[in-house]
């Protein structure tokens, strides 16, 4: 049985009512965002290795792209990170130095602050900041207001990491705190082998390891990954195969944990409503704004009663009450007939489900055909040509129980190819996602290597509810 949340965690997580009011109703709209400022479509895959990131109000969308025509002067031949401002229609490249110089290696894994000003990303480039001589992948933050790019995967005294810092980072609402995954052994004074999760305070320069138990001992083993951070930066969720982070961790598989940076307490979130541990792997967490609700993917069959579909599902654990619920269900609560998580575009996000700021809405993708009526779309041959088993993006409302499909065009017509890897704005209004479909917006005709059919070059879209 996992440890219960501390009183301090309960206090910081409590809010008035179980759910905040939902986002105001608005006409449904699906929009292509991986465009040049003049509206020209990209000539390469967007969302090549990472999910899009959406600001709190859904206006700013960050994404990676292989396209060379989204901005002028893109000649590095590498994956870059871009930001699209949906209000102004401007697209800019943010994986650049403080002088605007393009990176000399690939960049990916964007995360954005609540107001869209700060963008964290991962890069192998060595020319984004002065003194980058470690020859390793690092985590950077670009300030879109000042143009300044800083490296955050460094020790408190500025010493650069002795190994790679990788994957998609997580950034607090105000952009001050950045959580990231690193193999480096010299970011904090206490050495530890393997891969760990760290949090950098961009205001003070302090850095701490958070993949630790409640006594501060580091996770044992190689894997700690997929950080998520609460809006104020206090709580950090992550996945780890370590068995020493909480008492009685005997399931021998990867679990999801939450560390409270104020109290030092670490709890396991991938448990059932009675606190019993899962019987299979759990991974890819996300946190709502105050950190009360943890969404995660799991192949476990014992987290909720009646889980008999034999495929991975999406769950939400309430750190205040201890309740765990399955959210990859239809509007009547029926379980999915296909997996809702997976290793990639063939039926599951490589980056996991996402939860709105108030914890009410969860965005996820699934190959299930029974989550909504009329799910009969077929993917292109590159992905999956079985009718219905084409991954789509869904949103489940935990207050009303309703599940809707959002990887549709503005009139509600289903996509003609795969859609995966969602992010949802904190206000719940906007869902960003990756799609190879050509029919979500009019005039989607771009092509790229591997995807020669017009319009089926993967792009980043948003659906406004």
Q: Where do the model's predicted regions map?
A:
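Bacterial N-terminal signal peptides that target proteins for export
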Residues: 1-10
């Amino acid at each position: 049985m996992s440890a219960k949340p501390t009183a301090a965690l309960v206090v910081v997580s409590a809010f008035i009512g179980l759910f905040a009011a939902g986002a105001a109703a608005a006409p449904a709209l699906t929009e292509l965002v991986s465009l040049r400022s003049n509206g020209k479509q990209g000539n390469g895959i967007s969302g090549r290795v990472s999910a899009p990131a959406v600001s709190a109000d859904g206006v700013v969308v960050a994404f990676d792209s292989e396209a060379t025509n989204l901005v002028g002067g893109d000649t590095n031949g590498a994956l870059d990170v871009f930001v699209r401002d949906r209000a102004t229609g401007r697209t800019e490249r943010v994986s650049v130095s403080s002088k605007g110089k393009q990176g000399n290696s690939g960049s990916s894994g964007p995360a954005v602050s609540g107001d869209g000003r700060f963008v964290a990303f991962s890069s192998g480039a060595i020319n984004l900041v002065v003194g980058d001589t470690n020859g390793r992948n690092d985590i950077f933050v670009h300030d879109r207001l000042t143009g300044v790019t800083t490296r955050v995967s460094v020790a408190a005294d500025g010493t650069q990491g002795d190994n790679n810092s990788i994957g998609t980072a997580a950034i607090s609402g105000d952009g001050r705190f950045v959580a990231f995954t690193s193999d480096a052994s010299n970011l904090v004074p206490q050495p530890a082998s393997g891969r760990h999760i760290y949090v950098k305070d961009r205001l003070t320069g302090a850095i701490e390891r958070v993949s630790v138990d409640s006594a501060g001992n580091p996770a044992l083993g190689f894997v700690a990954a997929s950080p998520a951070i609460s809006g104020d930066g206090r709580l950090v969720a992550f996945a780890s195969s370590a068995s020493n982070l909480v008492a009685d961790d005997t399931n021998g598989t990867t679990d999801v944990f939450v560390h409270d940076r104020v109290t030092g307490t670490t709890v396991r979130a991938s448990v059932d409503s009675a606190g019993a541990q899962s019987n299979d792997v759990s991974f890819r967490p996300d946190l709502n704004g105050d950190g009360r609700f943890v969404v995660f993917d799991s192949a476990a069959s014992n987290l909720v009663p009646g889980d008999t579909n034999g495929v991975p599902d999406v769950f939400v654990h309430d750190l205040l009450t201890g309740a765990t619920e399955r959210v990859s269900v239809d509007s009547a609560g029926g379980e999915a007939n296909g997996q809702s998580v997976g290793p990639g575009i063939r039926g599951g996000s490589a980056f996991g489900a996402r939860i709105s700021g108030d914890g009410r809405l969860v965005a996820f993708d699934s190959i299930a055909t029974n989550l909504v009526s009329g799910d009969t779309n077929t993917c292109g041959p590159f992905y999956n040509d079985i009718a219905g088993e084409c991954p789509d993006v869904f949103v489940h409302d935990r207050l009303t129980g309703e599940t809707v499909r959002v990887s549709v065009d503005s009139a509600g017509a289903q996509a003609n190819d795969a859609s995966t890897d969602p992010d949802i704005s904190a206000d719940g209004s906007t869902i960003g996602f990756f799609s190879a479909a050509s029919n979500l917006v009019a005039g989607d005709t771009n092509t790229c290597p591997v995807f020669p059919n017009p319009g089926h070059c993967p792009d980043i879209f948003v659906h406004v509810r």
